[in-house]
Amino acid sequence: IYTPRTLFPYTTLFRSQMEALRHFKLAHSLRVAASEISGHLPLMKVSDYLTWLAEAILEQVLALAWRHTVAKHGTPKRSDGTLCDPGFVIVGYGKVGGIELGHGSDLDLVFIHDGDPQAETDGAKPIDSAQFFTRLGQRIIHLLTAQTNSGQLYEVDMRLRPSGASGLLVSSLGAFDRYQRNEA
């Protein structure tokens, strides 16, 4: 029986997208491992491919999390009044940032947003920009780390963000710039 996507509950579609990402990662990780074992890929290329795979997955995870958060709260605004689309960056540090990812590597990530801290989102359940981007960051971490039947995508380490584990999950672009200039 065929049922159009619009009839599926949102959570069912969301879970199927999470599973699809995990299958994508597993399939491509297997291809890289097989190429490595057979001698067709040198170690430097293995880390390149694994890093590119992580970047592709991060791009899709950001898109999924963005759609989910915007659907719930609306779109945040920048200081000039334009809508953020998304106005959010995932910065990779450590092995992912150095293009040195291995098969079991975690992702050292930092989240930065360009939203106006004084503005609210434009949706039915508006929240301030800082809260919106925090929820977006939490959703991204959940998508990456949640255990499903196919496992998890990656372990995530957020301790390299400004002020470490005691800092905000998502920094504004201005705060990140000040931190890099004065404290890093």
Range-by-range predicted roles:
Residues 1-6:
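Short, exposed "boundary/linker" segments that immediately precede the start
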Residues 7-184:
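A nucleotide- and high-energy phosphate-metabolite-utilizing enzyme signature
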